[in-house]
Amino acid sequence: MDGESPFLIALMGMDNLRVLYFHQHFSTPQGAAGIRSYQMARNLVRNGHQVTMVCGSYGGGNTGLDTPFLTGKRTGQVDGIDIIELDLAYSNADGFVKRSLTFLKFAVKSIGIALRHNYDVVFATTTPLTAGIPGIFARWLRRKPFVFEVRDLWPELPKAMEVIKNPVVLGAMSSLEWLSYRSAHRCIGLSPGIVDGIASRGVPRERIQLVPNGCDVDIFRQVGNPWRPEGINDDQFMAVFTGTHGQANGLDAVVAAAEVLQNRGREDIKIALVGDGKLKPQIQEMARAKGLDNIVFHAPVPKQKLVDLMASADIGLQLLANVPAFYYGTSPNNFFDYISAGLPVLNNYPGWLAGLIQQHYCGYAVAPGDAEAFADTLEHAADNKRELKVKGQRAREL
C-alpha cells in the first residue's frame, strides 16, 4: 500500500511482531466496504509479523469467515490474518441509539481481548472513536505500545453536522478523544486537517504521522468484465458515485445537478449512485418526485465488481455535504479508488482534495451548492473526451 507511516515501516523492520489490530468495520476485498485495514494487515503479514484483527459484523463488509458464531464470536484465518469477529451486527442505516450501543458493546468486548491476548503492539483505527478504548487499557494496564489511527475527527465532525447536540455526550466524546490521543505512542491522521486536529489537543507533532488513504493499485489493474448498471447504455457518459448514502455525503447535490441536465435535454449523461445508507430511500424519492430518469441507483457491490464497474465509467464523483469541517478533516476511500482506476474526479467541496485535483490536473472541482456549475462540468467532461482521457491518466499517475 502506498504512503505507509515511518513508524509502521519501523515496526515492519522488527522481527516477528504480534500485532493486535482493532477495526470494528473491517472487511476483505470480498465485501463492499473500505479495505485499508486489510491492506495494512496483509503488508504486516508479508513482512513476517502475526496480525490478529478484532472486528464486528459490518453491513456491506465481508470478513471472510462464514462459520457459526459461538459464545458471541467466530475465529479463523483469512489471507494470513487471524480474525476474531464479534457477533455485533452494524449497518449505516441503523438509528443513532442502536449504533451507539453497538459501538459500546464492541469496546467492552475489545477491552477483554486487550487484557487477555498475547501481543507486542496494539493498533486501533476509527471510526468509531470508541475503537481507541481497548488501546487505552492496553497502554496503561499492560504497558503495551499503542498506535491510534484517526480517520475522522470526533466529536468535531458530528458536532459540525449537528448529528450530536447533547453537550454531555459531546463532552464525554471530547474527553475520550483527548485520552485516546494522549495514551497513544503514535497517532496517525489520514488528512492534513486531521493531523492538525490531533496536534491541537496537545499531542507533539513528532508523535503524529500523516498517512493519507491509499489503494492497492494492483486490484484496479485486474479488470474482469466491465459492466454498467441497468438503464445506462455503453454509448452514454456515465458518472459514478460509490459509497454511503448518508447525511455526510450530500447526495442531494446530485439530484439538483441531474435536474439541470434533464432540463437541458442532456439524455446522453447518466449518473450511477452505487451503495447504501440511511438516506438512500429519501434520495430515491427526491429523484422520483422530480421525474429524473438520468439517475440510476444500484446496491453495494464487492471490490472486484466495483473494479469492473469503474473500468466502464467516465468520471468519479467525490461528494460531501457542505460542512467546513470536511474540507481538511476527511480522507475518503472512494477518491482513492477512483484515481487508482484511472478515473478523473469531480469534487464538489473545497479543501485539500480539491487542491490536489487542481494541482495534478486529474479532475474538476466545483463550488458546493452550485447545481448549474456541477451540471456545466459534467457537460464539459462529456463533450471533451480527449481532455478527460488526459485527466484519467494523471489520476492513475497520482
What are these regions (language model features)?
Residues P6-D79:
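N-terminal subdomain of nucleotide-sugar transferases
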Residues A199, R205-R207, C215-E230, G250:
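Acidic anion/phosphate-binding donor-loop and adjacent secondary structure
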